[in-house]
Amino acid sequence: MTAKTPLHTTHLACGAKMVDFHGWDMPLHYGSQLNEHHAVRNDAGMFDVSHMTIVDILGAGGRQFLRKLLTNDVDQITHNGKALYSCMCNEHGGIIDDLIVYQRASDNYRVVLNSATRQNDVAWIRAKSEGFAVGLQERRELSMLAVQGPNAIAKTLSILAPAHVDAVSTLTPFECVDVDHWFFARTGYTGEDGLEIIVPNEFITQLWNDLLNAGVTPCGLGARDTLRLEAGMLLYGQDMDETTTPLESGLAWTVKWEPEDRGFIGMGALVSQKQQGIKRKMVGLTLLDKGIMRHGQKVIIEGCPDGIITSGSYSPTLQQSIALARVPVETGEQVLVDIRGKLIPAKVGKPRFIKQGKPV
């Protein structure tokens, strides 16, 4: 039986086409994935992301624990109300998940994890927390809404209570704030500015309806996928997993090597890989002819082993097919993609195509 978020009946009332997403009945679109994509790039759209896993790490040992658990270093968080993106790796450097950690207080951290990895992640975090002065709380009584786009914050502020407006209006990117049991973060998964809002389940429907009345477009998983692909944001389980490392996934920037004695989980394996040099890297591909690149297609590189498309689609913003691909490190400026038996040329570039609505 599929799980449902507290907004399930609201999605149906809005005309959503629902699909099974890792055991959750979630909206794919509300009639036009294309219109939803453009709404986020040009105005404001909202996504129900209540299927995500929210875990609060409480206690005096929170910072010490997270410095061991994550590849990025929470010591970079210099004050409460800051967020940090990181990978969480196993002892071999394989990515268990990617996540955002928010410091709400010196003894209160919130991590938001992927829904597909909920059981694995929570079990891993719980096991690794032994010996640290921390307690874990999985917050299933909370719902989460992402409001994204150039007008997202302004439209959100227009429907909030004055106390919320005062707190949210001063947030800068990757900052967060708690107000009256509501949690606001200036983060997202679209490449646009916006907010991710976490509230008790009983408030989420009213928040959705207020945003709808303010002109925010409901958006489904389809638009979320093309938006994040254009922005070069990876999808766990598709672009990376426990068989790949941050260094092979364009995420070396999330690994903090110093101080050397921090000894985060997987550090030894990643240091070794860094010293030996990676054999595979993540790139962006832009198709130079007709066709659509899709997950799993082969990338043909002259004189090298084949690469693989990890994510591919049509880009509504660029109006051509784009993809993320893992290829041999020697790969040059052009490759061939096997699309249904036809070899189509593609240009190799950085694994990011759009920044704040503009081509990179």
Swiss-Prot record:
Gene expressing this chain: gcvT
Name recorded for this polypeptide: Aminomethyltransferase
GO cellular component, one term: glycine cleavage complex
Enzyme class: transferase
Keywords associated with the record: Aminotransferase, Transferase
EC number(s) per entry: 2.1.2.10
Quaternary structure, from the entry: The glycine cleavage system is composed of four proteins: P, T, L and H.
Purpose: The glycine cleavage system catalyzes the degradation of glycine.
Cross-referenced InterPro entries: GCS_T, GCS_T_bac, GCST_C, GCV_T_N, GcvT/YgfZ/DmdA, GcvT/YgfZ_C, TrmE/GcvT_dom1
Recorded superkingdom: Bacteria
PANTHER family: AMINOMETHYLTRANSFERASE, AMINOMETHYLTRANSFERASE, MITOCHONDRIAL
Catalyzed reaction equations: N(6)-[(R)-S(8)-aminomethyldihydrolipoyl]-L-lysyl-[protein] + (6S)-5,6,7,8-tetrahydrofolate = N(6)-[(R)-dihydrolipoyl]-L-lysyl-[protein] + (6R)-5,10-methylene-5,6,7,8-tetrahydrofolate + NH4(+)
UniProt GO BP: glycine decarboxylation via glycine cleavage system
Listed GO MF terms: aminomethyltransferase activity; transaminase activity
Protein family (similarity comment): Belongs to the GcvT family.
